[in-house]
Amino acid sequence: FNILNHSNIIDFNIKSAKVLDLYSGVGSFGIECISRGANYTVFVEKNKETSTVLEKNLCDLKIDNNKFYITNNEVNWYVQNNKAKKFNIFFLDPPYSDQLYPETLKVVKESKMFLNKNLVIIHRESGSKEDVSSIINILKVKNYGRSKIIFGTFLN
């Protein structure tokens, strides 16, 4: 989150943001956004056991139920069936073995679920080679050990 607060390349304020946390796992990113003032977060996690841990995390942290929604659907299904919803932060953290996430990103872009001021954050393995430059304008790529974080905005 420091890069969001202190970057001269990424100009984005989390306060009042509407966050779509795809492949959310136990919800670390979305929960952090809520703690920093995001309006709400939608967590999309198809694994029921993992989403149960996510629910427990939200409960343990006493996060207001109006600040989040959890769905146990496939990511692409959620996007296809919720096109009317608009978000300005999109976080994608697919399993490292998932090479198909660019298709998910493309579906999000084509669905027009993003507000004009938006930020896309993708967490991948540092050696991954998937190309998303036809879907997002890549602002910055940061490597952290085995991970890389891609920051961008949807292309119009």
Question: What is each residue range found by the language model?
Answer:
Residues 1-156:
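Class I S-adenosyl-L-methionine-dependent methyltransferase catalytic core
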